[in-house]
């Protein structure tokens, strides 16, 4: 699986066991990503932070 880094078009190949791409954004500024990368379990969103997870190459 390949996931985008914080600044596309840079990306990285995920290590074994981390099979989700994720994007973390602040709810007040949803268009500005704070973090991107590979993750094993999609975290729960909170009042301030929203997580978007997906399973396709470079989908974050």
From Swiss-Prot:
Additional information: Positive charges of Lys residues are necessary for cytolytic activity of this toxin, but not for its binding ability.
Gene Ontology biological process: killing of cells of another organism
Tissue: Expressed by the venom gland.
Record family assignment: Belongs to the three-finger toxin family. Short-chain subfamily. Type IA cytotoxin sub-subfamily.
Keywords: Cardiotoxin, Cytolysis, Disulfide bond, Hemolysis, Membrane, Secreted, Target cell membrane, Target membrane, Toxin
Domain of life (superkingdom): Eukaryota
Organism of provenance: Naja nigricollis
CC terms in the record's Gene Ontology section: extracellular region; membrane; other organism cell membrane
Subunit structure: Monomer in solution; Homodimer and oligomer in the presence of negatively charged lipids forming a pore with a size ranging between 20 and 30 angstroms.
Subcellular location: Secreted; Target cell membrane
Name of the featured protein: Naniproin
Xref: Pfam families: Toxin_cobra-type
Function: Basic protein that binds to cell membrane and depolarizes cardiomyocytes. This cytotoxin also possesses lytic activity on many other cells, including red blood cells. Interaction with sulfatides in the cell membrane induces pore formation and cell internalization and is responsible for cytotoxicity in cardiomyocytes. It targets the mitochondrial membrane and induces mitochondrial swelling and fragmentation. Inhibits protein kinases C. It binds to the integrin alpha-V/beta-3 with a moderate affinity.
S-S bonds: 3-21, 14-38, 42-53, 54-59
MF terms in GO: toxin activity
């Amino acid at each position: 699986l390949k996931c985008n880094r914080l600044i596309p078009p840079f990306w990285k190949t995920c290590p074994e066991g981390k099979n989700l791409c994720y994007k973390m954004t602040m709810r007040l500024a949803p268009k500005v990503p704070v973090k991107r990368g590979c993750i094993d379990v999609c975290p729960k969103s909170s009042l301030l932070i929203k997580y978007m997870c997906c399973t396709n190459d470079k989908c974050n």
